[in-house]
A protein has these predicted regions:
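Elongated, mostly alpha-helical coiled-coil "stalk/stator" tethers of large membrane protein machines
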Residues: 360-375, 379, 383-386, 399-402
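Short alpha-helical scaffolding segments that buttress acidic/His motifs in well-ordered protein cores
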Residues: 266, 290-294
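C-terminal helical "lid" subdomain and adjoining coupling/linker elements of P-loop NTPases
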Residues: 72, 276-283, 296-373
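Conserved ASCE/P-loop NTPase catalytic core
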Residues: 2-260, 271-288, 301-305, 382-496
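Amphipathic alpha-helical interaction surfaces
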Residues: 61-64, 87-91, 206, 296, ...
């Protein structure tokens, strides 16, 4: 019978006659995953960088009918993975109409469900629950109580129904029983107090729930997914050992392992409007630089590695990069523009809020650390485009940067305004002796726009390798010879 025909069924009797059979949620997930694997269908769409690591682990856990704990630093798509698991549920399932815990018509758990079927039999009304409504998420915080998750005796309900507190009908169910036949996610599990974690023991293993000494057998049909940050184990709490023992699969997530994957994630997640896309062109070089900032932050001695550096840093920084170029174009009355290396300094505010600094970083200050990370990103990416300047210090071979450096040593400087018109920007770069020749040497076939971006990049790259002096001013970036104004050099150049 097709799903369209099934949805027309409104009573238990009709459901029986249709030959419908229910199954528990873990079998649903398993069966639908098996079908997806056989057909080659992608299950976790948009989850990048996990195809050979995390996703196979999740698939194994689902096939094993396991509860899952996703362990990883912030910004590693743990919650997104959990939410996408609803795609493996059946599109619709039947529930007893009016049941607060989504009773299965063939195996009701609640007093309401059992009584309804006892009274109405095959005339029991059913309704169809869509898989999109079968996902429940709870953020673990220290103020969460057992009553919130499991339930409590409701004295008002007992009084209205004129029943004793020992009657099951006096119970007000908490979030977990109300999530029966659903995927239930508890985020940041270590933040849950130990005594609250203990309340989950029997639900996970035996299906019992206890409410203020009222013990009842209620084999809830749940797929639990927990998320946790390793930092939480020491800073805020821990997962108690018996609970950890009952979570059958613990899967460790990770950050993107290379720039290309990280870049794809950023392009997928960044919120850039159509107007911005039409106005601002962002060269691939700048996209690589944005991603490199996150990679530098994860290795930096100024950043707390235990806290992690979320993928949201790259996403926010990329959005700021586009907005910086867009703002310049709007101010100058330009209909379109190409993002520049200097626009990356507009990403500092995005970087500041995404990194946790250690003591040394706090001493330097968040802005200086952000500037330092940008400089390090430029330094790391520079050798992917041009020869390593360091090698010419050690070897007696012709230095391709020599004419550029000599031009600055001859008492020339270059002051690039952050809001420079394109023609003025190009004119200034063209004035640097040896710069055009260097670009033609390595990128002769590049477009005019690309060549000017590369020219600017060369100056930043040489500064990051201490071949030139770069001064970041309020409204411009000034390039001078290495030995001038050393005492006024900006923050990041002084960080080592």
């Amino acid at each position: 019978m097709s799903m369209k025909e099934l949805l027309k069924i409104k009573t238990l009797g009709d459901l029986k006659r249709a030959g419908y059979q229910t199954k528990n949620i873990k079998d649903e997930l398993r069966d639908n995953l098996i079908n997806s694997l056989k057909s080659g269908e992608e299950v976790f769409k948009g989850i990048l960088g996990y195809s050979t690591t995390v996703i196979p682990e999740i698939q194994r856990a689902i096939l094993s009918r396991h509860h899952i704990n996703l362990l990883g630093l912030r910004g590693q798509a743990k919650t997104r993975i959990a939410r996408q698991m609803t795609a493996l549920l059946d599109e619709y399932i039947p529930v007893i109409s009016g049941s607060e815990i989504h009773d299965d018509p063939f195996a009701p758990l609640s007093h309401y469900g059992r009584e309804t079927i006892a009274v109405k039999g095959d005339d029991t009304a059913i309704e169809w629950m869509h898989r999109g409504d079968r996902f429940v998420e709870k953020l673990a915080t220290p103020d969460v109580t057992v009553a919130d998750l499991i339930g409590d005796i409701d004295p008002i309900k007992a009084a209205n129904l004129k029943i004793s507190y020992s009657d099951e009908r006096a119970i007000h169910f908490g979030l977990i029983p109300r999530s029966n036949r659903c995927i239930f996610v508890i985020n940041e599990l270590p933040d849950l107090q130990a005594r609250i974690q203990v309340a989950l023991f029997n639900i996970l293993q035996e299906g019992d729930i206890q409410i203020r000494g009222f013990r009842m057998r209620m084999p809830l049909d749940l797929q639990f997914i927990f998320t946790a940050n390793p930092e939480d184990y020491t800073n805020r709490g821990s997962i108690v050992t018996p609970l950890k023992d009952r979570i059958q699969s613990q899967i460790v997530t990770h950050y993107p392992k290379d720039i290309e994957i990280s870049k794809t994630i950023t392009q997928q997640e960044a919120k850039i409007s159509k107007d911005q896309l039409a106005m601002v062109e962002v060269p691939d070089l700048l996209k690589n630089l944005i991603e490199q900032i996150s990679f530098e932050a994860r290795e930096s001695e100024y950043v707390d590695a235990k806290s992690g550096v979320s993928a949201r840093l790259s996403i926010s920084a990329y959005e700021n990069l586009v907005s910086t170029a867009e703002r310049r174009a709007l101010i100058l009355g330009e209909k379109s523009t190409v993002a520049r290396v200097s626009d990356i300094w507009g990403t500092i505010s995005a970087i500041n809020g995404k990194i946790e600094l250690v003591y040394e970083g706090e001493q330097e200050g968040p802005v200086n650390v952000a500037q330092f990370l940008i400089s390090q990103a430029i330094r790391s990416q520079f050798i992917n485009y041009f020869p390593d300047p360091e090698r010419f210090k050690r070897k007696k071979e012709e230095n391709p940067y020599q004419r550029i450096i000599q031009w600055f040593n001859a008492n020339h400087d270059l002051d690039i305004l952050l809001e420079e018109k394109q023609q003025d920007f190009e004119k200034k770069l063209a004035s640097v002796d040896g710069l055009s020749e260097l670009i033609d040497l390595y990128y002769k076939k590049s477009s005019v726009k690309e060549k000017f971006l590369l020219k600017e990049f060369v100056l930043y790259g040489l500064a990051s390798y201490s071949q030139l002096n770069r001064l970041s001013l309020d409204s411009s970036v000034l390039f001078k010879d290495l030995f001038s104004s050393v005492f006024t050099s900006d923050g990041p150049e002084n960080l080592n």
